[in-house]
């Protein structure tokens, strides 16, 4: 049995006396693409810093390739690299920024050629950018240079923290393409935290949900956030922006996150659910995307501003003529809702 790339056991991390991450057990395989989804403050950045061995967890076990490793230890420093959401560039030329990691490793062979190739990965021409000072770069260009500085190392693991959050659309596409090319060309394991959950669903082998410092689910669940209200009839639920009612079981707290795992499409059109505990919602298909892992189609549906997804066979998409912009009805069983 192959040793997982990461193995985490009973890990907790505390920041200024406040628990920010708690993982009972988690294993990440090598060579794949793992997406991490969660709202702001859920612990995504903390998780990536720990996985990047930038920080040491407060307690628990974090194994890399079957062995414990300390922050910045030699056994991980040359194999794992993290691109933070706001990466730091030195006040030097683009060439010196990209080449820095190789120089501190005393790997200076064919340096200019390797910098040129790394820049080409992120869509930058070395003739135009190599001698440009870092302060003369736009936000998107700076992010791409920072990524090139990681890619030149051909890392075994590349951790990306919201890599496209603060860049223009062109830079975002180039950053995404470069990361995926590294995975294809070198077998680099990608761990990506992003608000672009639709892109993550398309490219990831596994998608993990993180909420309030805890992992739950494997990507096929729908997560609906509070607040939740107690209605006059004694039921709990959430009134959506267009007046639709999303009924739920009693939440542990009014701001809890509901995990809705079994949402069904009702004949591809407006219709009624049959079960006594079924509830229906009406929404609009906004996107259809092929899932990398399953070969099925993930349909993104916007219900009064709440994004939901369901996974359907390609044949059903064709037979029911489903397409972006079409109105559909969904059904779910409200007593089966779990809480995070």
Residues of each region from the PLM?
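Glycine/charge-rich catalytic "coupling/switch" loops of P-loop NTPases
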Residues: 242-289, 318-340
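Catalytic Walker B motif of ABC-type/P-loop ATPase nucleotide-binding domains
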Residues: 158-162
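Conserved ABC ATPase "signature" region
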Residues: 110-128
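The feature captures the beta-strand-to-loop junction immediately N-terminal to the Walker
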Residues: 37-39
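Helix-to-loop junction immediately C-terminal to a conserved catalytic motif
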Residues: 52
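ABC ATPase NBD coupling module
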Residues: 67-81, 104
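Conserved ABC ATPase signature
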Residues: 133-137, 141
């Amino acid at each position: 049995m192959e040793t997982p790339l990461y193995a985490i056991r009973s890990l907790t991390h505390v920041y200024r006396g406040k628990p920010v991450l708690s993982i009972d057990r988690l294993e990440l395989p090598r060579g794949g693409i793992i997406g991490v989804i969660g709202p702001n403050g859920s612990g995504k950045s903390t998780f990536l810093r720990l996985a990047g061995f930038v920080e040491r967890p407060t307690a628990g076990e974090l194994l890399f390739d079957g062995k414990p490793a300390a922050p910045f230890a030699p056994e991980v420093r040359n194999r794992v690299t993290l691109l933070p959401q706001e990466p730091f560039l030195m006040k030097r030329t683009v060439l010196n920024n990209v080449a820095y990691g190789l120089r501190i490793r005393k790997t200076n062979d064919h340096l200019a050629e390797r910098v040129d190739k790394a820049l080409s990965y992120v869509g930058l021409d070395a003739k135009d950018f190599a001698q440009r000072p870092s302060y003369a770069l736009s936000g998107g260009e700076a992010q791409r240079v920072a990524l090139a500085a990681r890619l030149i190392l051909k890392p075994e693991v590349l951790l990306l923290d919201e890599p496209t959050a603060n860049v223009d659309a062109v830079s975002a596409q180039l950053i995404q393409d470069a990361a995926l090319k590294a995975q294809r060309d070198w077998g680099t394991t990608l761990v990506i935290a992003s608000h672009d959950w639709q892109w993550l669903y398309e490219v990831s082998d596994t998608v993990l949900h993180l909420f309030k410092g805890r992992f739950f689910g494997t990507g096929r669940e729908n997560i609906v956030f509070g607040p939740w209200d107690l209605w006059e009839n004694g039921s709990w639920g959430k009134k959506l922006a267009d007046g639709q009612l999303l009924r739920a079981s009693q939440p542990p707290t009014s701001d809890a996150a509901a995990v809705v795992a079994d949402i069904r499409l009702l004949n591809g059109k407006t219709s009624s659910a049959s079960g006594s505990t079924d509830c229906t919602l009406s929404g609009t298909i906004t996107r259809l995307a092929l899932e990398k892992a399953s070969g099925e189609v993930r349909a993104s549906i916007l219900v009064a501003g709440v994004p939901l997804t369901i996974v359907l066979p390609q044949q059903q998409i064709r037979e029911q003529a489903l397409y972006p912009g079409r109105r559909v009805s969904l059904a779910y069983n409200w007593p089966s809702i779990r809480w995070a």
